[in-house]
């Protein structure tokens, strides 16, 4: 079986398009449509790079009436992309969502500033993101949400086989049943020292 990418899952992430450095834009313009297989000048942010990939249901329907490789009912399903899952992601500053994503929020009204700042005692996130995100609109991600990985045909779970439940943020703060997308539960958590 030949796999042409896919089997990717994106849940409750925040995508912020940073300004493209002029030299990177110049390189992309120079390459135009003459990119090579190693460098496509990918400086744009979001899951839109998966446009054209199937959802699981679309992918699974290819195998209905399966009668063996080469049969008319299966066509090229062995050489197509694997499915993609995406839901509840937030997109800012021109970042773009996958065309089939559910519950995506694309904010074209606000500009998000985000950077890492070094202080005497460590590294901190500097952002206005949590002034913009005020609503808890995503659910908790778990083994049940993630389903099974394609190749091992196994669920995403802890090493001991127990279910994964992402109910804590980066610092171990408990998330509510309805939570904010991203690594932190709220603005206060995002202001803590990272490292």
Please give the residue ranges for each predicted region.
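Substrate-binding/catalytic cleft of secreted carbohydrate-active enzymes
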Residues: 1, 26-27, 42, 71
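Right-handed parallel beta-helix/beta-solenoid
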Residues: 1-6, 79
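Extracellular/lumenal ectodomain signal focusing on beta-strand-rich modules
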Residues: 7, 12, 87-88
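Feature marks extracellular polysaccharide-active and adherence modules
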Residues: 11, 16-18, 92
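Non-catalytic interaction/regulatory modules that flank or connect domains
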Residues: 16, 28-33
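Short glycine/acidic-rich loop motifs that flank beta-strands on beta-rich extracellular proteins
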Residues: 19-26, 95-101
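Surface beta-loop-beta hairpin patches that serve as ligand-binding interfaces in beta-rich domains
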Residues: 32, 37-195
């Amino acid at each position: 079986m030949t796999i042409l990418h896919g089997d990717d899952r994106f849940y409750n992430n925040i995508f912020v398009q940073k300004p493209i450095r002029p030299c990177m834009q110049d390189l992309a313009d120079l390459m135009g449509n003459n990119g090579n297989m190693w460098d496509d000048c990918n400086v744009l942010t979001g899951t839109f790079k998966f446009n054209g990939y199937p959802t699981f249901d679309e992918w699974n329907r290819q195998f209905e009436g399966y009668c063996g490789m080469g049969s008319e009912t299966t066509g090229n399903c062995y050489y197509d992309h694997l499915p993609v899952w995406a839901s509840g992601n937030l997109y800012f500053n021109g970042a773009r969502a996958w065309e089939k994503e559910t519950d995506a929020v694309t904010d074209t009204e606000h500009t998000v500033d985000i950077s890492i700042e070094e202080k005497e005692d460590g590294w901190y996130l500097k952002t206005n993101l949590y002034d913009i995100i005020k609503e808890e609109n995503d659910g908790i991600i778990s083994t049940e949400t993630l389903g099974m990985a394609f190749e091992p045909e196994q669920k995403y779970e802890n090493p001991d086989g127990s279910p994964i439940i992402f109910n804590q943020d980066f610092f171990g703060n408990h998330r509510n049943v309805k939570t904010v997308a991203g690594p932190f539960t709220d603005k206060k958590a995002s202001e803590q020292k990272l490292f």
